[in-house]
Amino acid sequence: EGFRESGLSLEQSKALIQLGVELADKARNDFLTENPDGKAYVAASIGPYGAYLADGSEYRGNYRASPETIREFHTGRIEAIRELAEQFDFWAVETLPSLDEALIVADLLAADPHPAWFSFTLKDEEHIPEGMSLAEVTRALDEIPSVTAIGINCCHPGWVMDMRILSTGCISA
């Protein structure tokens, strides 16, 4: 959507999204050529709908958008990246402010063979911006087979250790 609003066509927008994956894959291959015993992975990054709005709402979660609008926003980007399935290793769904948005993206990725991690912003030591506790978020996402990791980002550094404590007992083995 952001590319489209900048005057690019749908095809140009798709090409730019895919270029990010292609450049990351090339960087990985260059690294592995120079470091044959090394390991390198490419994450296909999916950011929040609020980042497109460019109003800071990715940190608040108050998009005032319908679930259908959020689904449509993520669908096009995911489909563009999915065409390059051989060039990335996992999905990194990052900086989400709400469980609702995470569940929409998880549903879109449900049939995808790549594992996915989901990370959230926090409004305080225990809650994501929409108000749900991190423990509740962890329990909800733990039910989804493709979700392999849950984390936090873009938050106060002191809250990172608290997340480990809060999520203890919420994740299945």
Give each language-model segment a name.
Residues 1-173:
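Domain-level signal for soluble alpha/beta catalytic cores
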